[in-house]
Structure formats: structure tokens, C-alpha cells
A protein has these predicted regions:
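N-terminal alpha-helical targeting/anchoring segments
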Residues: 1-99
Length: 99
């Protein structure tokens, strides 16, 4: 398992927990959700499109969903230094230097 697969699994667990708490609707499958290498002009280590994939189902803008999900991702992982939300709704993760 590589770092992108690891963080994709973490993100899936987080959104599943939000679903169980009634805070977020999720599809039957996680098709289309990814965690990947960000474009070179972004200062982050991983980028995910989770908010964009879930926005239509939740009837919220991708930016609104990303703003809701991103602090929860950061709270659950002590290796994350910063999380930024960028249009149209990507969540960009930067790790602490020790990682």
C-alpha cells in the first residue's frame, strides 16, 4: 500500500463515520474518489476530490463540503501540517516535515 492508497482509505473511513452520524450522505460505492499527486504548482503532498464527488448527492457546493470535511481529516491525523481547500473543491494536504 502506498501513501495515496493509505490516505484514500483514511478519507473513506472519515466520510463513512460522517454518514453514520447523519452528517453526510455517501454513495453505495466510493467510485471516483481519489487521493493523488497534486499539480506541481501546488504546495501540498496529496490532493483529494472527495468533496466534488459527494457534492451532488449532498446538495451542497464542493467548496462547502470540502470546508466541512477538511478540518475533520486534519483532526484525525497528527502527521498533517496543513489542509487547504481550493476551487472547485479539492482538499490539499501537506504533511509535517517529519513525515
Amino acid at each position: 500500500m502506498n501513501i495515496f492508497e493509505l490516505y484514500l482509505d483514511k478519507i473513506k473511513l472519515i466520510i463513512s463515520d460522517l454518514n453514520k452520524n447523519g452528517e453526510l450522505l455517501i454513495p453505495d460505492t466510493f467510485n471516483g474518489i481519489n487521493a493523488e499527486i497534486p499539480p506541481p504548482n501546488f504546495d501540498c503532498d496529496i490532493s483529494t476530490n472527495v468533496a466534488m464527488v459527494l457534492s451532488k448527492l449532498n446538495k451542497k457546493s464542493p467548496l462547502e463540503l470540502a470546508e466541512k470535511i477538511s478540518p475533520i481529516i486534519k483532526e484525525k491525523d497528527s502527521l498533517i501540517d496543513t489542509i487547504n481547500v481550493v476551487k472547485p473543491g479539492f482538499i490539499n494536504i501537506k504533511f509535517k516535515p517529519l513525515f
